[in-house]
Amino acid sequence: FMDFGMSFTQEGQFFSQFLGARTSNSLNDMFELGILPKIKGLYRRDYAKHMDFDGTEDTEIDAVLLTHAHVDHCAYLPYLREDIPIYCSEESKLILQNFDETSSSQYLTAKQRFQIYENKKGTMSKATGDKVAIPRRVEIFESGKEFSIDSINVEPLPVDHSIPGVHAFILHTSDSTIG
């Protein structure tokens, strides 16, 4: 899977700067509007179990290769299932970390929603903060140094772009090379 970003044109048909998807139902909104594909095993379990998925299905997605941290390439990573590894450059990871620290985004740590627990008073409370934080698996690659994801060898090549840490990938399989 390569990148998981938003299409400005597609989102612009339905949303604006001050009108976005509903916070508590955003994944369903994205499905209904045709913005995100409905693929079982791709999305966060805490979201998926409130959709047509049960959230426990196996995933066929081995990883996400992130070319860089512009939103048209990474905006939908917060919807990604937390156990699917994200492969990126150190620079891209730092940019994603900055997004997490300066906004309500959840690029590197998924904070589970819809989690309830019995508090000390014996009543039900909504779990928040570190109680519901699940760190995502982020794998840092070195520029120009080949690495493997299952049977695919990935060759990350640096690309000049408007932010640091941008890479193109050449994928080497037993049958062919893509890139």
PLM-predicted stretches and their roles:
Residues 79-81:
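Short, conserved loop/helix-junction motifs that constitute active-site signature segments
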Residues 135-137:
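Eukaryote-biased recognition of long, low-complexity, charge-rich segments
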